[in-house]
Curated annotation (Swiss-Prot):
Record family assignment: Belongs to the terpene cyclase/mutase family.
Superkingdom of the source species: Eukaryota
Signal peptide: none
EC number: 5.4.99.41, 4.2.1.128, 5.4.99.39, 5.4.99.34
Active site, per annotation: D483 (proton donor)
Protein role: Multifunctional enzyme that converts oxidosqualene to lupeol and 3,20-dihydroxylupane. Minor production of beta-amyrin, germanicol, taraxasterol and psi-taraxasterol.
Coiled coil ranges: none
InterPro entries listed in its UniProt record: SQ_cyclase_C, SQ_cyclase_N, Squalene_cyclase, Terpene_synthase_CS, Terpenoid_cyclase/PrenylTrfase
Organism annotation: Arabidopsis thaliana (Mouse-ear cress)
Keywords: Isomerase, Lyase, Repeat
Stated name of the protein: Lupeol synthase 1
Stored PANTHER family: LUPEOL SYNTHASE 1 (PTHR11764:SF87), TERPENE CYCLASE/MUTASE FAMILY MEMBER (PTHR11764)
SUPFAM superfamilies reported in the protein's UniProt record: Terpenoid cyclases/Protein prenyltransferases
One cellular component (GO) term of this entry: lipid droplet
Length: 757
């Protein structure tokens, strides 16, 4: 059986190192001897259940580790369930019953180090490049044994669409990019080309013109594999890093994620690296094209993209720049003497940046796309070197196993989920159920704060300060995030107001000051707050977005969600520390409020960048406005936000928004009559922020009834549609959200309806 391990220590692996003894690390191990017949049967039943319902609910319920934790803690619900047939039956007792049942279940899921585990997956282009990299380097079977590979195959099969293709994410229609990547992944994992899944996928690809229509990222990876030719890819010259840093197109100016993707890509492109041409690679050249491989016009193929993948079409200026690099610049840089005088130096510089990122992130890197590229670049530089071995040691940090198989996560969301969990438990006001969990969670947050800036002259490496930050996952990751820092800071401040005997010693004041300093540094002149770094690029740089299937990839920008989190954290901080940077904090909050008001859409909502979508951002926006002292009577933006929510409430009392809202950038209700419990919780809390309980309780009663009646027998809530998002088109499955937010919403509802009133 598979078991989730919460890690301390490195197991004597000399290639693993940590800043805090691996607090928060999550890895999966397979134990052939583990599990009773009943436990193994329960796992198989969970797998069958997902497979049978995979086209109805695309995201897994993340059951394997939950079953393990509940078993280890000998969890029994013990509290009978109460339901409400109408809103008149929603009493203090009914609400408290559902809340207590949910809290009892949720606290049993807390890990020993204080965080709440949970997968963060969804995109179907995460896993294949990892398999490609390990196949090229000859480490596939060394890193992933037969049990790993079986679960990977399960995941790929479970998420194949009925038409034979794979979507950009688990709920998406089929696209060429992910269909090709997952087809090749199946073949590398040993599947026969005539096996049903392969056969249907290959037919989907060929029906749309073959693999020459794959988007740019796909052309890049296929060139590395030797299934495509480098001459058919768009140039990614490493010399861009050698340009003067003041130039607007310098990589140091662009969004950190794109920067950390482009640097290893430019190294591999600059070397025109191609992996071993194995018999399988030769077969793939035959299987994926409509014409003989040797006769393909690669120059023409460079501009061919499947219509299913096109979200962001290249503007003319980008194509002109690409043509100039391809036809005039690259021929010079790849010939003597410039190949020695310039290209070699550029390649050395890119590796310097790669090693810097690797060391400062403990070889986790900023995310899974970058991880694989950096790992492959290290192997190309030195196949037997320690850099590559250190990368191999951190692969388990990215892998996750559930009833739908093994997948690769974007990276962990340990801190993010834990911050929300603590706030939900605090709101529940059930100390007999939550005190121990709050203390453990407090310890995790304290242990996870980044205590220093990146090493050395970090500004010359285009990094921002990180001292005082919290990351999305754990301290070892190292990358500061504004909203993660704000949510963790809120937790520290809220817990500091409680007895240390209950929740542990509060964090040092200086560490709080460091966090405030970081948050203030990430605010732009327009009042909005960026996610990772201050804005360095002009907005027009988005014209050079090299992907066809994502948007907003080039420029660090301000986000309503981040801005709201920071308002709430700074407002709480100034109440507890009124003399620390008082004027700066007050001014920061004023500007942030103005930014939120300025970014409201005509229908009263706000666009969500990190969740689905308008409901998500509206919850944040109204929470930020309320924290800053805005009220329904005095603030037009708040009244318009309330109007949006009340007019989108469904007949069952809940809310449901389609993930298509993210790409279409307009509110689109989800299909069918069923509401989404997580989105219902966001909307419910947003209304509570605005004082809805003082105006009309009926919308809140209706939403509470839906949440209470949807609770499962054991205190869990059902998994529904995907609700996380990034870069307009990519969706993320946060499995823990289905517990955190319904509990939090019920807690806030109980407080304002039955306790305050």
């Amino acid at each position: 059986m598979w078991k989730l391990k919460i890690g301390k220590g490195n197991g004597e692996d000399p290639h693993l190192f940590s800043s805090n003894n691996f607090v928060g690390r999550q890895t999966w191990k397979f134990d052939h001897k583990a599990g009773s017949p009943e436990e193994r049967a329960a796992v198989e039943e969970a797998r069958r259940g997902f497979l049978d319902n995979r086209f109805r609910v695309k995201g897994c319920s993340d059951l394997l580790w939950r079953m393990q934790f509940l078993r280890e803690k000998k969890f029994e619900q013990g509290i009978p369930q109460l339901k409400a047939t109408n809103i008149e039956e929603i009493t203090y007792e009914t609400t408290t019953n559902a809340l207590r049942r949910g809290v009892r279940y949720f606290t049993a899921l807390q890990a020993s180090d204080g965080h709440w585990p949970g997968e963060i997956t969804g995109p179907l282009f995460f896993l294949p490049p990892l398999i490609f990299c390990l196949y090229i380097t000859g480490h596939l079977e060394e890193v992933f044994d037969a049990e790993h590979r079986k679960e990977m195959l399960r995941h790929i099969y479970c998420h194949q669409n009925e038409d034979g293709g794979w979507g950009l994410h688990i709920e998406s229609k089929s696209v060429m990019f992910c269909t090709v990547l997952n087809y090749i992944c199946l073949r590398m994992l040993g599947e026969n080309p005539e096996q049903d899944a392969c056969k249907r996928a290959r037919q989907w690809i060929l029906d749309r013109g073959g693999v020459i229509f794959i988007p740019s990222w796909g052309k890049f990876w296929l060139s590395i594999l030797g299934v495509y030719d480098w001459s058919g890819t768009n140039p990614t010259p490493p010399e861009l890093l050698m340009l003067p840093s003041f130039l607007p197109i310098h990589p140091g100016k662009i969004l950190c994620y794109s920067r950390m993707v482009s640097i290893p890509m430019s190294y591999l492109y600059g070397k025109r690296f191609v992996g071993p041409i194995t018999p399988l690679i030769l077969l793939l050249r035959e299987e994926l094209y409509l014409e003989p491989y040797e006769e393909i016009n690669w120059k023409k193929s460079r501009r061919l993209y499947a219509k299913e993948d096109m979200y962001y079409a290249h503007p003319l200026v980008q194509d002109l720049l690409s043509d100039t690099l391809q036809n005039f610049v690259e021929p010079l840089l790849t010939r003597w003497p410039l190949n020695k005088l310039v290209r070699e130096k550029a390649l050395q510089l890119t590796m310097k940046h790669i090693h810097y990122e690797d060391e400062n992130s403990h070889y986790i890197t900023i995310g899974c796309v970058e991880k694989v590229l950096c790992m492959l670049a290290c192997w190309v530089e030195n196949p037997n070197g320690d850099y590559f071995k250190k990368h191999l040691a951190r692969i388990p940090d990215y892998m996750w196993v559930a009833e739908d198989g093994m997948k690769m996560q974007s990276f962990g969301c340990q801190l993010w989920d834990t911050g929300f969990a603590i706030q939900a438990l605090l709101a529940s006001n059930l100390p007999d159920e939550t005190d121990d969990a709050l203390k453990r969670g407090h310890n995790y947050i304290k242990a996870s704060q980044v205590r220093e800036n990146p090493s050395g002259d970090f500004r010359s490496m285009y990094r921002h300060i990180s001292k005082g930050a919290w990351t999305f996952s754990d301290r070892d990751h190292g990358w500061q995030v504004s909203d993660c820092t704000a949510e963790a800071l809120k937790c520290c401040l809220l817990l500091s107001m409680m007895s240390a005997d209950i929740v542990g010693q509060k964090i040092d004041d200086e560490q709080l000051y460091d966090s405030v300093n970081l948050l203030l540094s990430l605010q732009s002149g327009n009042g909005g707050v960026n996610a990772w770094e201050p804005s360095r690029a002009y907005k027009w740089l988005e014209l050079l977005n090299p992907t066809e299937f994502m948007a907003n990839t080039m420029v660090e920008r301000e986000f309503v969600e981040c801005t709201s989190s920071v308002i709430q954290a700074l407002d709480l901080f100034r109440k507890l520390y009124p003399d620390h940077r008082k004027k700066e904090i007050n001014r920061s909050i004023e500007k942030a409020v103005q930014f939120i008001q300025d970014n409201q859409t005509p229908d009263g909502s706000w666009y969500g960048n990190w969740g689905v979508c308008f409901i998500y951002a509206t919850w944040f926006a109204l929470g930020g406005l309320a924290a800053a002292g805005e009220t329904y009577n005095d603030c037009l933006a708040m009244r318009n936000g309330v109007h949006f929510l009340l007019t989108t409430q469904r007949d069952d009392g809940g809310w449901g928004e389609s993930y298509l809202s993210c790409s279409e950038q307009r509110y689109i209700p989800s299909e069918g009559e069923r509401s989404n419990l997580v989105q219902t919780s966001w909307a419910m809390m947003a209304l509570i922020h605005t004082g809805q309980a003082e105006r009309d309780l009926i919308p809140l009663h209706r939403a509470a009834k839906l949440i209470i009646n949807s609770q499962l027998e054991n205190g869990d809530f059902p998994q529904q549609e995907i609700v996380g998002a990034f870069m307009n088109t990519c969706m993320l499955h946060y499995a823990t959200y289905r517990n955190t937010f319904p509990l939090w919403a019920l807690a806030e509802y109980r407080k304002v309806v039955f306790i305050v009133n």
